[in-house]
């Protein structure tokens, strides 16, 4: 049983956090009667040991009263001199404003989060310092530094020097990145040099001069008993029968003709005496062979027998 009043004498009803009336008992479950006046700003109540004596101090407000589960205003009310009855010392349990109120402010948490986030953000500056300006791959890495293909293209000018228009030099220049394409205009020069072998086959032969004496010599040599005129400007070999007929029919006349030609040839030679002897000796051997053949044939006699 609690008979509590405020400073103006109004009764104060003890309830729990849900507004339900609270029955005060001691540690053995016996009802406890509390009387007192609540005043503002008092932290220690009027200690009247009352019925329970000093041994039952602090059970009411601490265990089941408004202090238990008190938040804010309820804690402040319970911390006043409400427990000035027989259960003294209850007022010291002022848990309200100190435990739950502003004392538990998030200064530490707020400061910690704010400071940590700021420092981390500035340190990890991935923007312009990390990737932006440092990794300038564009102009320095691939652009002008790798423009060496054009120089190689100019060095390999195979067109005008090597073979001519067949190579032309233009294909070699295209191996660059496009910067040296116009420089390799060696096509015109290659055509001029390459046309040098065009004079092949223009060999001229001096006309062969023939004298009347040379023609006579050619005819005399070609009119031997081994060949005859084929009617087309050439010579063909005589048959054995044709040779015998010539020797039998007009052999004497032909032999005289051969002797005359041989004599003419020896007269125009550089050494007439020696050449004439050699030819006449050759004709003499031919006559001996023919005379022998005629002697073997019936009805004919050797020219030497006449």
UniProtKB/Swiss-Prot annotation:
Bias (Low complexity) ranges: 32-44, 194-204, 260-278
GO annotations of cellular component type: cytosol
Amino acid composition bias (Basic and acidic residues), ranges on this chain: 205-218, 243-259, 279-298
Region annotation (Disordered) ranges: 1-57, 80-171, 188-306
UniProt xrefs under Pfam families: Dehydrin
InterPro entries membership: Dehydrin, Dehydrin_CS
UniProt feature, compositional bias: Gly residues: 85-119, 127-151, 159-171
Record's compositionally biased regions (Polar residues): 12-23
Family per similarity comment: Belongs to the plant dehydrin family.
Entry protein name: Embryogenic cell protein 40
Species name: Daucus carota
Gene: ECP40
């Amino acid at each position: 049983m609690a008979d509590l009043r405020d400073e103006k004498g109004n009764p104060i009803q003890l309830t729990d956090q849900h507004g339900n009336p609270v029955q005060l008992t001691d540690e053995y479950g016996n009802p406890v009667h509390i009387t007192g006046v609540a005043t503002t700003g008092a932290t220690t109540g009027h200690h009247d040991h009352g019925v329970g004596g000093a041994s039952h101090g602090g059970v009411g407000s601490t265990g089941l009263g408004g202090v238990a589960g008190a938040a804010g205003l309820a804690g402040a009310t319970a911390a006043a001199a409400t427990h000035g009855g027989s259960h003294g010392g209850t007022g010291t349990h002022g848990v309200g404003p100190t435990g739950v109120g502003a004392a538990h402010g998030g200064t530490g948490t707020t400061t910690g989060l704010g400071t940590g986030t700021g420092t981390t953000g500035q340190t990890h500056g991935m923007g312009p310092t990390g990737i932006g300006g440092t990794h300038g791959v564009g102009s320095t890495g691939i652009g002008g530094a790798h423009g060496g293909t054009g120089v190689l293209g100019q060095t390999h000018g195979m067109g005008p020097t090597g073979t001519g228009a067949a190579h032309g030099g233009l294909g070699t220049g295209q191996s660059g990145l496009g910067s040296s394409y116009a420089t390799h205009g060696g096509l015109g020069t290659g055509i001029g040099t390459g046309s040098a072998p065009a004079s092949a086959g223009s060999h001229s032969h001096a006309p062969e001069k023939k004298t009347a004496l040379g023609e006579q010599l050619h005819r005399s040599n070609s009119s031997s008993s081994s060949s005859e005129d084929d009617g087309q400007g050439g010579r063909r070999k005589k048959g054995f029968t044709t040779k015998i007929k010539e020797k039998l029919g007009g052999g004497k006349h032909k032999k005289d003709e051969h002797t005359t030609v041989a004599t003419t040839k020896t007269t125009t030679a550089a050494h007439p005496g020696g050449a004439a002897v050699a030819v006449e000796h050759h004709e003499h051997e031919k006559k001996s062979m023919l005379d022998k053949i005629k002697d073997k044939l019936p009805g004919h006699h050797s020219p030497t027998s006449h």
